[in-house]
């Protein structure tokens, strides 16, 4: 079972006040519901591929409206042959839709999200929970990038959902995607805040544990890469210094260098692997600071560069 599926399973076992259950059910039906006319009346179907979510919808309808809905199971024939679960409400569908803020008394759909359904903070969180159950997904925290999204077919609904999410500073964005619109959250910290908000506390703890280990591992890798880069830089610099000292020795002799440069050149030849600090501590005439050694080696490099320039001119 995927991390997203585990998260949804946890959410379907939550208990809540009637106002919050109504908000959650409103989001579930708003996103996964469809209407049809049968036998002269309005029939509401709520469709999902998740058995736990189907049971959740069935239970909420029964509890809130004292209606026994029908639970149908269909087999998908294309691609993944998963079961499709349909919670069918053959009676009082229009009354339920009006009470949930999805349709008005003239049976016209209410755009976006009805304000009376999400008046309270707890109900806003429950509405986001229902939306996530209906059309949400979240990457496993071990994935290369953090990503949580909720898909909907309607732009106005996506924007309204994003507005609610951002009341909690979740940095949610709404973008158009093929066949619909997506609310998404990219930051690991904001995803944990979203999971906490909708009540997925077990998923949150697991996500945080994995995220902490992952971030520590990434930090260690960055530090290791930085150390390797520094070592390579030091080795390359030492190699260049050795080449320059050998060139000076061949062309003019190290004995003709000023004493302070000759000392450092001879030490570098004798100890090609030590760092500048260690080199400075070995200078015969007295300890020289790291910056002092670096300055003298730059002077040696400049002398070698001038020799090369003369060689190029003579050629």
Swiss-Prot record:
Membership in a protein family: Belongs to the WhiA family.
HAMAP family: HTH_type_WhiA (MF_01420)
GO BP term, pick one: regulation of sporulation
Alphabetized GO MF terms: DNA binding
Coiled coil stretches, renumbered: none
Functional summary from the UniProt entry: Involved in cell division and chromosome segregation.
DNA-binding region listed in the record: 275-309
Name of the featured protein: Probable cell division protein WhiA
Keywords of this entry: Cell cycle, Cell division, DNA-binding
Gene3D superfamilies: Homing endonucleases (3.10.28.10)
Gene for this chain: whiA
